[in-house]
Amino acid sequence: MSRNKKLRLLVTTKCPHHCPLCCNNSWNFDELPRVNRWNYQQIMITGGEPLIHPIKVQLLTETIRSITDMQGTNPEIFLYTSICDSRLDRILDSVNGIVLTPHNKDDVERFLKTNSRFLEMKGVGYWHTISLRLNLFKDIKEMLPEGVDLSLWKVKDMEWIKDCPVPEGEDFRRIENLW
């Protein structure tokens, strides 16, 4: 039996949004298996909203890097978040990429400021190595100004999926003690 190569790692169920169709509404997290291995090609840190706890996210990524270094593996680490402020800046040098999903008008306004700043820093430092992914639901996409430069981002149009099945080839696990 082959092992899955991607891990969706739940670190918290806390979230500032209360989306009626949120994937988390369809899971019993007490029954979700605990992570028991780290030899994945990709680890996706998710929640709830992980960046409610930016220091813990940073410590977790450092711990994962230490463990996988000893194992001789080097997984890509992605952070799934809706937060687009200084907390995001704090974690950027600890991950291979972010997957940002703005949820409301305030998120869009913060994203536009961050995007402008990122565009100014394009080509400086580690920016060429970071994967920037932007998930946009239709109503959020319509809030973006016409002609906004999204060239740094891999943009994915999103829609709510009932019951949110785990994609094939992925494990969905949680840390032992959720934040």
Give the positions of each predicted feature.
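Metal-dependent catalytic neighborhoods of phosphoester/phosphodiester hydrolases
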Residues: P54-Q58
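Charged helix-capping and loop-helix junction motifs
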Residues: L59-E62, K113-T114
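Glycine-enriched alpha-helix->loop->beta-strand junction motifs that scaffold or abut catalytic
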Residues: L92-V99, E146-L150
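Auxiliary Fe-S-binding modules of radical SAM enzymes
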Residues: K122-W179
